[in-house]
């Protein structure tokens, strides 16, 4: 079997939900791809004050994306920084924690279990909206590194995934991103990118790759991977003389903190299967056009997926897995004066660039 099917799988996994501040809709579709490698998590109530949303686009396999959808939010929850109210540092640490957890005997066992579960469902789409009260919840000892067995020296998976995560607490929005999935906010109808795509052509990414001993060929790291930050991909993280953030490929996320205001309409997180077909502003315009016509936000997401699906595999665009999470803000968001997008940043963590979508064509 090649990377594409003879006919696309257009059945979708869709969900809706809401709390007193937010409305949620999401949808995912396998499309033309031979396997579904996307995963997502959506928790309107991570705790009594905080919501968590994430999109994870797998490559080379799907288990790392599934692993992150299952465990990343719980690592945010159990962080001391999270308890202290520092969401940016908490989610930043959780990205690196995913790589740590996937090593050793326990990591091998968890990835194997996820792989078996995926294989048993025979390629059907599995919705991954996980409860924070799962097996790796905020309680109990974090004993992953202490489990021993025949795979104690397991270095971690060679496949990987992007991770684009948003946390919302009161009027604060925190976005963390590694890879080329993207988070976009609509403010008064204008699309603003709250993450940047980590690609080899970026100078800072290229410099890190070369200094770590890698190279770029035909737009790909070591002729293989076409993005520069990801969770997993352990073959690119083997330099024992470098910290995790300086490896050829790193899970180090850009962190962006935004103060929400009443001009904010909605937030979108989506994998590159969407962004390869629509610019940020085109997607925002499409959502505004359909959000009043459809009965639910998930129906709007389904419209987007159908809009992006290619009629054939000729050309490549519109042939990828597609996942989209749409979060609508209930008004009023705040009684405070209008805030500037990106006016706050997390201390000690690089702030992602935020550009009006039409400025960079994305």
From Swiss-Prot:
<dbReference type="InterPro" id="IPR036457">
    <property type="entry name" value="PPM-type-like_dom_sf"/>
</dbReference>
<keyword id="KW-0904">Protein phosphatase</keyword>
<feature type="binding site">
    <location>
        <position position="58"/>
    </location>
    <ligand>
        <name>Mn(2+) 1</name>
    </ligand>
</feature>
<keyword id="KW-0378">Hydrolase</keyword>
<feature type="domain" description="PPM-type phosphatase">
    <location>
        <begin position="23"/>
        <end position="329"/>
    </location>
</feature>
<dbReference type="GO" id="GO:0046872">
    <property type="term" value="F:metal ion binding"/>
</dbReference>
<dbReference type="InterPro" id="IPR015655">
    <property type="entry name" value="PP2C"/>
</dbReference>
<feature type="binding site">
    <location>
        <position position="57"/>
    </location>
    <ligand>
        <name>Mn(2+) 2</name>
    </ligand>
</feature>
<keyword id="KW-0479">Metal-binding</keyword>
<dbReference type="Pfam" id="PF00481">
    <property type="entry name" value="PP2C"/>
</dbReference>
<feature type="binding site">
    <location>
        <position position="272"/>
    </location>
    <ligand>
        <name>Mn(2+) 2</name>
    </ligand>
</feature>
<dbReference type="GO" id="GO:0004722">
    <property type="term" value="F:protein serine/threonine phosphatase activity"/>
</dbReference>
<comment type="similarity">
    <text>Belongs to the PP2C family.</text>
</comment>
<dbReference type="InterPro" id="IPR001932">
    <property type="entry name" value="PPM-type_phosphatase-like_dom"/>
</dbReference>
<keyword id="KW-0464">Manganese</keyword>
<protein>
    <recommendedName>
        <fullName>Probable protein phosphatase 2C 11</fullName>
        <ecNumber>3.1.3.16</ecNumber>
    </recommendedName>
</protein>
<dbReference type="GO" id="GO:0007165">
    <property type="term" value="P:signal transduction"/>
</dbReference>
<keyword id="KW-0460">Magnesium</keyword>
<dbReference type="InterPro" id="IPR000222">
    <property type="entry name" value="PP2C_BS"/>
</dbReference>
<feature type="binding site">
    <location>
        <position position="57"/>
    </location>
    <ligand>
        <name>Mn(2+) 1</name>
    </ligand>
</feature>
<feature type="binding site">
    <location>
        <position position="320"/>
    </location>
    <ligand>
        <name>Mn(2+) 2</name>
    </ligand>
</feature>
């Amino acid at each position: 079997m090649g990377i594409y099917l003879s006919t696309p799988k257009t059945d979708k996994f869709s969900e809706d939900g809401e709390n007193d501040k937010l409305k949620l809709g999401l949808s995912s579709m396998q499309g033309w791809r031979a396997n579904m490698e996307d995963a997502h998590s959506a928790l309107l109530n991570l705790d009594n004050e905080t919501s968590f949303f994430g999109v994870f686009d797998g490559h080379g396999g799907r288990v790392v994306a599934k692993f992150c959808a299952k465990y990343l939010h719980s690592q945010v929850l159990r962080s001391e920084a999270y308890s202290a109210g520092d969401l940016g540092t908490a989610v930043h640490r959780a990205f690196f924690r995913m790589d740590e957890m996937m090593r050793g005997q326990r990591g091998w066992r968890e990835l194997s279990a996820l792989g078996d579960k995926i294989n048993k469902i025979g390629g059907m789409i599995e919705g991954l909206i996980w409860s924070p009260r799962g097996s790796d919840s905020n309680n109990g000892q974090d004993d992953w590194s202490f489990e021993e067995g025949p795979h104690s020296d397991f270095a971690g998976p060679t496949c990987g995934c992007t991770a684009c995560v948003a946390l919302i607490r009161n009027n604060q929005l925190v976005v963390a991103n590694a890879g080329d999935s993207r988070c976009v906010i609509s403010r008064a109808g204008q699309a603003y990118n709250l993450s940047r795509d980590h690609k080899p052509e970026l100078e800072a990414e290229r410099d890190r790759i070369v200094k770590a001993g890698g190279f770029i060929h035909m737009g790909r790291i070591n002729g293989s991977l076409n993005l520069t930050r990801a969770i997993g991909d352990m073959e690119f993280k083997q330099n024992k003389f470098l910290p995790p953030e300086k490896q050829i490929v790193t899970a180090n996320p850009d962190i962006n903190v935004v103060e929400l205001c009443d001009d904010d309409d909605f937030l979108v997180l989506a994998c590159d299967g969407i962004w390869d077909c629509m610019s940020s502003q085109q997607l925002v315009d499409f959502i505004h056009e359909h959000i009043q016509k459809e009965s639910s936000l998930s129906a709007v997401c389904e419209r987007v997926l159908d809009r992006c699906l290619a009629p054939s595999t000729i050309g490549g665009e519109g042939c990828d897995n597609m996942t989209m999470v749409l979060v609508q803000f209930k008004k009023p968001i705040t009684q405070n004066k209008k805030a500037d997008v990106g006016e706050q940043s997390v201390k000690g963590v690089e702030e992602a660039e935020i550009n009006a979508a039409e400025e960079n064509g994305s």
